[in-house]
Regions:
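Generic hydrophobic alpha-helical segments
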Residues: 149-152, 247-251
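Soluble non-transmembrane domains of integral membrane proteins
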Residues: 1-8
């Protein structure tokens, strides 16, 4: 029976490990590229989200529960990882889809921060256990998904459709289906979530990662072109010396600092 449970949870555990590895790879890629040129933070937040999600997947498998030396710590770690999921998800949606809302994302993020503080306070004061306040985390995950859907609908309403929007539209169907399936299984008493939702989420994340990497490469190329054009505008091609265009910012600074007596 023990071996059967390990084999049964082998695929979900492998999918969780793949998510963690993919998230670490994305974080490493963003940190490396960020030193060379300005790129969007969408890859950063997607890497944090994928790593957190993969670690939660690993802890929610039956094999990790059976192999855990400290079940209490295992349960608390799983709940805390789930608490942290909505924030990087909403920040990724805002940067990836280039949402124009000024306050909605911030309000949801601060609501999630307040929810985390309340849940941890109740746990530390022995008023409510993390398992008893799990419904609050589910509410915040639902709000994050609603923000995702709102951003997509807002883009369609203003006719600003891009390939990123179509990817997120298809991904939202997968995300909502997997979310409702997992929550239904949880409230029905299931101890483990099925591999179908994990596979769908992994494919969605891989698609987002590839598209985000492609966009970052375009941003790097645009930055290099801008630097090259600026160098061509400020230097003479034959002599390599700076021309008068290079000294215009200096002249403006000098003129602004002149004081008449």
């Amino acid at each position: 029976m023990f071996r059967h449970e390990l084999l049964k949870a082998g695929i979900p555990l492998l999918l969780g490990i793949m998510n963690v590895a993919l998230g670490i790879l994305m974080l490493t890629y963003w940190l490396f590229v960020h030193h060379w040129a300005y790129v969007s933070k969408s890859m950063l937040y997607l890497g944090i989200l994928t790593t957190d999600l993969g670690a939660w997947f690993c802890l929610e498998t039956g094999s990790s529960i059976l192999l855990s030396q400290n079940p209490v710590f295992h349960s608390y770690a799983s709940r805390i990882l789930l608490l942290l999921l909505p924030i990087p998800f909403m920040m990724f949606v805002r940067h990836y889809l280039k949402a124009k809302d000024q306050y909605l994302c911030r309000i949801f993020v601060w609501l999630d921060v307040a929810e985390i503080a309340v849940v941890l306070f109740l746990q530390l004061m022995d008023i409510r256990d993390l398992t008893q306040t799990l419904w609050m985390t589910h509410v915040m995950i639902g709000l994050a998904v609603l923000y995702f859907i709102y951003t997509i609908c807002n883009k369609f309403y203003h006719h600003t459709t891009t390939h990123a929007l179509w990817i997120c539209t298809i991904g939202s169907i997968i995300l909502i289906g997997a979310l409702f399936s997992d929550m239904f299984n949880y409230y029905q008493g299931a101890q483990d979530i099925g591999p179908a939702g994990r596979i769908a989420m992994l494919l969605f994340i891989v698609t987002l990662a590839c598209d985000t990497a492609f966009v970052s490469l375009k941003e790097i190329d645009a930055g290099r072109r801008a630097a090259l054009y600026r160098e061509l505008a400020e230097k003479d091609l034959l002599t390599g010396c700076y021309n008068r265009n290079a000294y215009q910012p200096v002249q403006k600074t000098d003129k602004s600092s002149v004081v008449c007596i």
